[in-house]
C-alpha cells in the first residue's frame, strides 16, 4: 500500500555528528564479535559507550550499519596471501579494529599528557596560593573560574538543545511504517447491521485535513475500554447506566451500510472508501446507553505527538435521522495552578491532548490487554460475523468497536504490540494482521526502541479546540482532572485503571498538584492491576526503557466524562483515578505497591564505561533489554555492582575510561584511599593508577620511575613468595569468609590476605615497600585481633609475622645497601625520581616515607620494647638481619607490642645462648705479652687481601664513615645479649685475634685487667666492642695500634663508660659476619674508623667532649661540602634577606653549628641534629615554595638525613652485636631516635 513506501530512507536521516575514535572502536569491536549482519546485537552491546550528550538514536541499528559502512570504505581490504596451514588470515574487521586501537592509544597518550600538564599547573598555582603570593588576585581568579564554568555550561546547553532539535526533526520527518495495523472489532447487540463487523472512525474531511496535515498519521477510535498511557487512562463505556432518556443523538456522519462491509474491513479500506461508505456501529452502555468512542490522532509534525480524543456518541438502532447540524459548546476551565485552556470541541467532540509516542504506545498496549481480558472473561453476546476467509475470529474487544491506526517511528508501537500480543496471548487474529515480515520488523523495532532516552519528548498540557463547526448540536462535556506527583516508576507490567462512577459534573479542570515546567516524558500511571501482567517481556522491557528515560514524575488523571442530551439530561461522570504501581512515597497516591526490585530495574539497562572496561573485555557481558525469568536471581547483585558506576557515568567523558580502577572492592583490598596516608606522601606526583596505564606516560622522569617500579615489583614478589611458602601461610592465602569465621567482617573492617596483596601488587595499588609492609602487618593484625590469645591461629599469626618481618627487614637492608653502593652519596632519591623534582609540603619535614632508610630508622625506636619489657631478646636469625625494620606506624591499629612476639621463642635456644658466654671470658682476658708478635703476624697474613680491597674503595665512601659514638647517642642502645649464642660459631683464628686485641687493650689501660669479677665470674668492666677486633686486624704496625688506642681512649669515654661497668666482656669478634660475609658498609666502616676506635675505659668528661668533637667534625665537613651548602655556610644578613630576623626567630647556619660544637654548646648527637634541622627549617619557612633556596634546602636536608640514617643503622648494628647488657649509652637521649 501507499503508506509503506519510503521505508528505507531512514539511512539518510540519522545523526550527522562525527563519531569519536572511542565509539568507532566500540562499534568495530562489537561487529568483529557479533558479525556485520547482527545489528541488533551490535547496537545493544555498544549503547552504554555513547559519549555524553549523544541523541537517543545515536547507536540505532541503521546508524551503526551506516557508520560501519563508512569505516569499510575508508579501510583497504588486506590482500590475501598464500600462507602455510594454520596461518590466520587477517580480515577487514581485524584491520579496522587494529587501526582504531592504535588511534585510541595515541589519543589516550595525548589525554594523559594533557592531564599531567594540567595537574602540574594546578599544583603550582595551589602552592602559590598557599604561600600567599596570589592573595591580591584571589577574587579575580574566583571570578574567572566562575565565568569559565558558566560559559562551559552555556555551551553544553546550546549543544544539547541543538542535538535535541535535530533529533526531534529526524523524528518528525520519518516515513510511515510499511503497513497500518487494524484491530478487528465486532458490533454489540444493538448494532444496526447485525452480522457485520465495522470499525468506528470519524473520518470527515475537516478532521483529516487538520489532523493529518503533512504526514500520514494514525487515528484510534475507541468504543469501549481503556485509554492507557503511562499516565492517561480513560475507561469509557461498558458500565455506564442509561442516561436519562437512554439514547444519545448520533452525529450527522451516520451513513447506510455498505454491502462490501459485511466482512472485517481494514483501515486502508476505510481510507479508500471515505467517511460515507460505512455506517457507524452502535454501542451501548451496559445494555441501553450507547458508548462514546475515543479517538487519538497524534500528528508527528510537531515536536511531540498529539493524541486527539474524540467523543462520538453512538445512535441507537432505530434512529436513522439525516444529518443534523451541530453546535459547539465550550465548557468552563478551572485551573488552580497551571492555567491550560481546555475547550470541548464540536462534533465529533475532538479534544487534542499533547503526548509523546511512548504514552501512545502504552495506551494501545493496555487497551488490547484489558479488552482481551474482558473479552475472555465475559461470553460474547451478539451476532458473530465470519471474517473474510470465513473463519470466526476472537477479537481483542468482544463488546467494543475498535479501529486502530498509528504512525510511530520506523515501525509503530501498535504493530509491535499487536504482533507480540498475538504471539504471546495466542489471539487468533486475521491473517492480514500478521505476517513474517511484520514479526521480524517488530523484533527489530523492539531492539531499536529500547533505549531509555528514545522518546524524551516533554508532556504538554494545552488542550486546544480542534475545529469549529457552524452548525450547533448539544455536545457532551468532558471533565479532566489532573494531579501531578513525583515518584519513581520501576517496572511497567501493564498498568490499567478501574472505572469509578462519580457525581455529575459540568466543568473541565486541570489541577496540577505540583506546578512544574515542561517535564520531559513525564510518566502518568493510572490504575492498579495484579502483578501478573499479560504484557509480554519484550513489551515490558520497551515500556520500562521509555519510563527510565523520562523524568520520574507521575500524574493522577481523573477524567470525568459527562455526556448529556440537552439541558434536561443529567450528566453522568466517568471518573478515572490513576494510581502508580510503585512510588517513591506512598503518600503521593492511592494504593502504592512496593516493588522489591526497584533498585534492580533502575540499573538493569545501563552500564557505565568504567565498569565495562575494567572487566578485561569490552563486550564481555551483554545487557539484556528485557527482564527475563532469572531477573530476581541475579538482578540484585547486578544492581549493586552498577549503582556506583552509574552515578559516576554522567559527564565523565574520557575520564571514565581512564579510571581503570582494579576490580578489587574496598572490602577486598582492605584499605581505602583516605586511610592510606602513605600514598598521599610518597605518591604525590602524577602517578597513574595502574602500571598498565602508566606505559602511556611520556615524561622522562616517569619512564625512569616505571623502570624502577618494574624492578621493585620483581624484588618484592620474592618477599611475597617467601611469605606464601611459610609453613603457616595456608591460613592467610585466601580471604576469610563468614562461613569459616562467623562474624569476622563485623570485627575486622579491613580484611587482608596474601592473594589480595599479590593482586594489589600486580594492579599497582601497592607501589612501595612501605605499602607492602603495611598490608602484611594489617593481615596479621586482623588475625591477632579476631582470634583469642589461646587460639592456634593467633600463635600462627604471631610466629609467621615475626618470620615475614625478618624477610622484609632483609629486603630493606639489601635495597639500602644496593642503592648506597651504586650511587654513593648521590643526589638521586631512593624512589628513582630525579633529585630536582619539586617536593610536596609533606616532604618538607621528613625523609620520603617510602625510602628504606626511613623505614629502617623508624623501626629502631621499637627496639626498646624488647629491652624495657624484659622479654626474650632477638635470636640469631634476627641478628643476621641487616637492621631493625619499621613497625607500621601509619595506622594505630597496626601498632603491635613487639615484646609480645617473643612469647613463642624456644627456651632451649635461650639456654644455649646464655651458656656460651660464661665459658670463655676468663681465657679471653689472659694477657700473654710474649705471644703478641706471633699473633700479630698471623693477623696481618689473614687480613692482607681485605686491606688491598679497602684501599681501593675507602676514598669513595669516606664521607659515610663516622664513629660509633653517633649511633650510640642518636640511635638505639646496644643490646647486651646480641652476641650470645654466636661464640660457638666463631672460628679459632678470630678468637685468637680478639684475644690479642684484649691484651692490647689491657696494656693501654691497666684498669681493665685489674677490675674484679662479678658473681658469675664476669668482669665488671667490659673490653672494647667486638668491632674493635676487626678494626685492630687492619693495623699494619703495632705503634699505630697503640697510638690509636690512646686516641680512642679519649674519644669514646662518654659513650661506653656508663654501660661497661656491668657488662661482661665481648671476648670474640664473632658477630655472625666473617670476612667473606662482611657487607661493604661494614668493611668501610671498619677501615674508616680504624684510626680512631680503641678500648674505652677512662671516665673523663673533657676527653669525652674532645672525642665527641672529633667524631662530629667529619660529619660537619661532609655537610659543608654538599653541592647546595653555599647558602647555609654563613649567617643570613639583613641585606641578603630583608625581614629575615622578623620571620626567623632562631637563625642557624653551618658556621654557627661548628662554633657551638667547638665551644661545647652541642654535647650530644640529638642537639647536633636539632640545630641542623633548624637550619633547614628556617630556609623552608622564610623562602617561597618556588624559590631556588627552598628547593635546595629540602633536597639537601633529605640527602643529609639519608646518609646519617645509613650510618646510624650500621653503626648501631655493629655496636649492638658487640655490646653487652646495660643502661642506655646516653641517659639524656635514652637511646630514642631523634630523626
From Swiss-Prot:
Residues 97-171 form a coiled coil. Residues 706-811, 1099-1207 form the Bromo domain. SMART domains: BROMO. Pfam families: Bromodomain. The modification N6-acetyllysine is found at residues 85, 481. The modification Phosphoserine is found at residues 383, 387, 579, 621, 637, 641. One of its GO terms (molecular function) is transcription coactivator activity. InterPro entries: Brd8_Bromo_dom, Bromodomain, Bromodomain-like_sf. Residues 905-915 have a biased composition (Acidic residues). Residues 831-846, 979-999 have a biased composition (Basic and acidic residues). SUPFAM superfamilies: Bromodomain. Keywords: Acetylation, Bromodomain, Chromatin regulator, Coiled coil, Growth regulation, Isopeptide bond, Nucleus, Phosphoprotein, Repeat, Transcription, Transcription regulation, Ubl conjugation. GO terms for biological process: cell surface receptor signaling pathway; cellular response to thyroid hormone stimulus; chromatin organization; positive regulation of DNA-templated transcription; positive regulation of double-strand break repair via homologous recombination; positive regulation of transcription by RNA polymerase II; regulation of apoptotic process; regulation of cell cycle. Residues 186-205, 551-597, 621-672, 827-848, 903-940, 966-999 are annotated as: Disordered. GO terms for cellular component: mitochondrion; NuA4 histone acetyltransferase complex; nucleoplasm; nucleosome; nucleus; Swr1 complex. There is a cross-link at residues 469, 481, 509, 575, 612 (Glycyl lysine isopeptide (Lys-Gly) (interchain with G-Cter in SUMO2)). It is found in: Nucleus. Component of the NuA4 histone acetyltransferase complex which contains the catalytic subunit KAT5/TIP60 and the subunits EP400, TRRAP/PAF400, BRD8/SMAP, EPC1, DMAP1/DNMAP1, RUVBL1/TIP49, RUVBL2, ING3, actin, ACTL6A/BAF53A, MORF4L1/MRG15, MORF4L2/MRGX, MRGBP, YEATS4/GAS41, VPS72/YL1 and MEAF6. The NuA4 complex interacts with MYC and the adenovirus E1A protein. Component of a NuA4-related complex which contains EP400, TRRAP/PAF400, SRCAP, BRD8/SMAP, EPC1, DMAP1/DNMAP1, RUVBL1/TIP49, RUVBL2, actin, ACTL6A/BAF53A, VPS72 and YEATS4/GAS41. BRD8 isoform 2 interacts with RXRA/NR2B1 and THRB/ERBA2. May act as a coactivator during transcriptional activation by hormone-activated nuclear receptors (NR). Isoform 2 stimulates transcriptional activation by AR/DHTR, ESR1/NR3A1, RXRA/NR2B1 and THRB/ERBA2. At least isoform 1 and isoform 2 are components of the NuA4 histone acetyltransferase (HAT) complex which is involved in transcriptional activation of select genes principally by acetylation of nucleosomal histones H4 and H2A. This is Bromodomain-containing protein 8. It comes from Homo sapiens.
Amino acid at each position: 500500500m501507499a503508506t509503506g513506501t519510503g521505508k528505507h530512507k531512514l539511512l539518510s536521516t540519522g545523526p550527522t555528528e562525527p563519531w569519536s575514535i572511542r565509539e568507532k572502536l566500540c562499534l568495530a569491536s562489537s561487529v568483529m564479535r557479533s558479525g556485520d549482519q547482527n545489528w541488533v546485537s551490535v547496537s545493544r552491546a555498544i549503547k552504554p559507550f555513547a559519549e555524553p550528550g549523544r541523541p537517543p538514536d545515536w547507536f540505532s541499528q541503521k546508524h551503526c550499519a551506516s557508520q560501519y559502512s563508512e569505516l569499510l570504505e575508508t579501510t583497504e581490504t588486506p590482500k590475501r596471501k598464500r600462507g602455510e596451514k594454520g596461518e590466520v588470515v587477517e580480515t577487514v574487521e581485524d584491520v579496522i579494529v587494529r587501526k582504531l586501537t592504535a588511534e585510541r592509544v595515541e589519543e589516550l597518550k595525548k589525554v594523559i599528557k594533557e592531564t599531567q600538564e594540567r595537574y602540574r599547573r594546578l599544583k603550582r598555582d595551589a602552592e602559590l596560593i598557599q604561600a600567599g603570593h596570589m592573595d591580591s588576585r584571589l577574587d579575580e581568579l574566583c571570578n574567572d573560574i566562575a565565568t569559565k564554568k558558566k560559559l562551559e555550561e552555556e555551551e553544553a546547553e546550546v549543544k544539547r538543545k541543538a542535538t535535541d532539535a535535530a533529533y526531534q526533526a529526524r523524528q518528525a520527518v520519518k516515513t510511515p511504517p510499511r503497513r497500518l495495523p487494524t484491530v478487528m472489532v465486532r458490533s454489540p447487540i444493538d448494532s444496526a447491521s447485525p452480522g457485520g463487523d465495522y470499525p468506528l472512525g470519524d473520518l470527515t474531511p475537516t478532521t483529516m485535513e487538520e489532523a493529518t496535515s503533512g504526514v500520514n498519521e494514525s487515528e484510534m477510535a475507541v468504543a469501549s475500554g481503556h485509554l492507557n498511557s503511562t499516565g492517561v487512562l480513560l475507561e469509557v463505556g461498558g458500565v455506564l447506566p442509561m442516561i436519562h432518556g437512554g439514547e444519545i443523538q448520533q452525529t450527522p456522519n451516520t451513513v447506510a451500510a455498505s454491502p462490501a462491509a459485511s466482512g472485517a474491513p481494514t483501515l486502508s479500506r476505510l481510507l479508500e472508501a471515505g467517511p460515507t461508505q460505512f455506517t457507524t456501529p452502535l454501542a451501548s452502555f451496559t445494555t441501553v446507553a450507547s458508548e462514546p468512542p475515543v479517538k487519538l490522532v497524534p500528528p508527528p509534525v510537531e515536536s511531540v505527538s498529539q493524541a486527539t480524543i474524540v467523543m462520538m456518541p453512538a445512535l441507537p438502532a432505530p434512529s436513522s435521522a439525516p444529518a443534523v447540524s451541530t453546535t459547539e459548546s465550550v465548557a468552563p476551565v478551572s485551573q488552580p495552578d497551571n492555567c491550560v485552556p481546555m475547550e470541548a470541541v464540536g462534533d465529533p467532540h475532538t479534544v487534542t491532548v499533547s503526548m509523546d509516542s511512548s504514552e501512545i504506545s502504552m495506551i494501545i498496549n493496555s487497551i488490547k490487554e484489558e479488552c482481551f481480558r474482558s473479552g475472555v472473561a465475559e461470553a460474547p453476546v451478539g451476532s458473530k460475523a465470519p471474517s473474510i476467509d470465513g473463519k470466526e475470529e476472537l477479537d481483542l474487544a468482544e463488546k467494543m468497536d475498535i479501529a486502530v491506526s498509528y504512525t510511530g517511528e520506523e515501525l509503530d508501537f501498535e504493530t509491535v504490540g499487536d504482533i507480540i500480543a498475538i504471539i504471546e496471548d495466542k489471539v487468533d487474529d486475521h491473517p492480514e494482521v500478521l505476517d513474517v515480515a511484520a514479526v521480524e520488523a517488530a523484533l527489530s523495532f523492539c531492539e531499536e526502541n529500547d533505549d531509555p532516552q528514545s522518546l524524551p519528548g516533554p508532556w504538554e498540557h494545552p488542550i486546544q479546540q480542534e475545529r469549529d463547526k457552524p452548525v450547533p448540536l448539544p455536545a457532551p462535556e468532558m471533565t479532566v482532572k489532573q494531579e501531578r506527583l513525583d515518584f519513581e516508576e520501576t517496572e511497567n507490567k501493564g498498568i490499567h485503571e478501574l472505572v469509578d462512577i462519580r457525581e455529575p459534573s459540568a466543568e473541565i479542570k486541570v489541577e496540577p498538584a505540583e506546578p512544574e515546567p515542561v517535564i520531559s516524558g513525564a510518566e502518568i500511571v493510572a490504575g492498579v492491576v495484579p502483578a501478573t501482567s499479560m504484557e509480554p517481556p519484550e513489551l515490558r522491557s520497551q515500556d520500562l526503557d521509555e519510563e527510565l528515560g523520562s523524568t520520574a514524575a507521575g500524574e493522577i488523571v481523573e477524567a470525568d466524562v459527562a455526556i448529556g442530551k440537552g439541558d434536561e439530561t443529567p450528566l453522568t461522570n466517568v471518573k478515572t483515578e490513576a494510581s502508580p504501581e510503585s512510588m517513591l512515597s506512598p503518600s503521593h497516591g492511592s494504593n502504592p505497591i512496593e516493588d522489591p526490585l526497584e533498585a534492580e530495574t533502575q540499573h538493569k539497562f545501563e552500564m557505565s564505561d568504567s565498569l565495562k572496561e575494567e572487566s578485561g573485555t569490552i563486550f564481555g557481558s551483554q545487557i539484556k533489554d528485557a527482564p527475563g525469568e532469572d531477573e530476581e536471581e541475579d538482578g540484585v547483585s547486578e544492581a549493586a555492582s552498577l549503582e556506583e558506576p552509574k552515578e559516576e557515568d554522567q559527564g565523565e567523558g574520557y575520564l571514565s575510561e581512564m579510571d581503570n580502577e582494579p576490580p578489587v572492592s574496598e572490602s577486598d583490598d582492605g584499605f581505602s584511599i583516605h586511610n592510606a596516608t602513605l600514598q598521599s606522601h610518597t605518591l604525590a606526583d602524577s602517578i597513574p593508577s595502574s602500571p598498565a596505564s602508566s606505559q602511556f606516560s611520556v615524561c622522562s622522569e616517569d619512564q625512569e620511575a616505571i623502570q624502577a617500579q618494574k624492578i621493585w615489583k620483581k624484588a618484592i614478589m620474592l618477599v611475597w613468595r617467601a611469605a606464601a611458602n611459610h609453613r603457616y601461610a595456608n591460613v592467610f592465602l585466601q580471604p576469610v569468609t563468614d562461613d569459616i569465621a562467623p562474624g569476622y567482617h563485623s570485627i575486622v573492617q579491613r580484611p587482608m590476605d596474601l592473594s589480595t596483596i599479590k593482586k594489589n601488587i600486580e594492579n599497582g595499588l601497592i607501589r612501595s615497600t612501605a605499602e607492602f609492609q603495611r598490608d602484611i602487618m594489617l593481615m596479621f593484625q586482623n588475625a591477632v585481633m579476631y582470634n583469642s590469645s589461646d587460639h592456634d591461629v593467633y600463635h600462627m599469626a604471631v610466629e609467621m609475622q615475626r618470620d615475614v618481618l625478618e624477610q622484609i627487614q632483609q629486603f630493606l637492608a639489601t635495597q639500602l645497601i644496593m642503592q648506597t653502593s651504586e650511587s654513593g652519596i648521590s643526589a638521586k632519591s631512593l624512589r628513582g625520581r630525579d633529585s630536582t623534582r619539586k617536593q610536596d609540603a609533606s616532604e618538607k619535614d621528613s625523609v620520603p616515607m617510602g625510602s628504606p632508610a626511613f623505614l629502617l630508622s623508624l623501626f629502631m625506636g621499637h627496639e626498646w620494647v624488647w629491652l624495657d619489657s624484659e622479654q626474650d631478646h632477638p635470636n640469631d636469625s634476627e641478628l643476621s638481619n641487616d637492621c631493625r625494620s619499621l613497625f607500621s606506624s601509619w595506622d594505630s591499629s597496626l601498632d603491635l607490642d613487639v615484646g609480645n612476639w617473643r612469647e613463642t621463642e624456644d627456651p632451649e635456644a635461650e639456654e644455649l645462648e646464655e651458656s656460651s658466654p660464661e665459658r670463655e671470658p676468663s681465657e679471653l682476658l689472659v694477657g700473654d705479652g710474649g705471644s703478641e708478635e706471633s699473633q700479630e703476624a698471623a693477623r696481618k697474613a689473614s687480613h692482607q687481601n681485605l686491606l688491598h680491597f679497602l684501599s681501593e674503595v675507602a676514598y669513595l665512601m669516606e664521607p659515610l664513615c663516622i664513629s660509633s659514638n653517633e649511633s650510640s647517642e642518636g640511635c638505639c642502645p646496644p643490646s647486651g645479649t646480641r652476641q650470645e649464642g654466636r661464640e660457638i660459631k666463631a672460628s679459632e683464628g678470630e678468637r685468637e685475634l680478639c684475644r690479642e686485641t684484649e691484651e692490647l687493650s689491657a696494656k693501654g689501660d691497666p684498669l681493665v685487667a685489674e677490675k674484679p669479677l662479678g658473681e658469675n665470674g664476669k668482669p665488671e668492666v667490659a673490653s672494647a666492642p667486638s668491632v674493635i677486633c676487626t678494626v685492630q686486624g687492619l693495623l699494619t704496625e703495632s705503634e699505630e695500634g697503640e697510638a690509636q688506642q690512646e686516641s680512642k681512649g679519649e674519644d669514646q669515654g662518654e659513650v661506653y663508660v656508663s654501660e661497661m661497668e656491668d657488662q661482661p666482656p665481648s671476648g670474640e669478634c664473632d658477630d655472625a659476619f666473617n670476612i667473606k660475609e662482611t657487607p661493604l658498609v661494614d668493611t668501610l666502616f671498619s677501615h674508616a674508623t680504624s684510626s680512631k676506635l680503641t678500648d674505652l675505659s677512662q671516665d673523663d668528661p673533657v676527653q669525652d667532649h674532645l672525642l665527641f668533637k672529633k667524631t662530629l667534625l667529619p660529619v660537619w665537613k661532609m655537610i659543608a661540602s654538599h653541592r647546595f651548602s653555599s647558602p647555609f655556610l654563613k649567617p643570613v644578613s639583613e641585606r641578603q634577606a630583608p625581614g629575615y630576623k622578623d620571620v626567623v626567630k632562631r637563625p642557624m647556619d653551618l658556621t654557627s653549628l661548628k662554633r657551638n660544637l667547638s665551644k661545647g654548646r652541642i654535647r650530644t648527637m640529638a642537639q647536633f641534629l636539632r640545630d641542623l634541622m633548624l637550619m633547614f627549617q628556617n630556609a623552608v619557612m622564610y623562602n617561597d615554595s618556588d624559590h631556588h633556596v627552598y628547593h635546595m634546602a629540602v633536597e639537601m636536608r633529605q640527602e643529609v638525613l639519608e646518609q646519617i640514617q645509613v650510618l646510624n643503622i650500621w653503626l648501631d648494628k655493629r655496636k649492638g652485636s658487640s655490646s653487652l647488657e646495660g643502661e642506655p649509652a646516653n641517659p639524656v637521649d635514652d637511646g630514642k631516635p631523634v630523626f
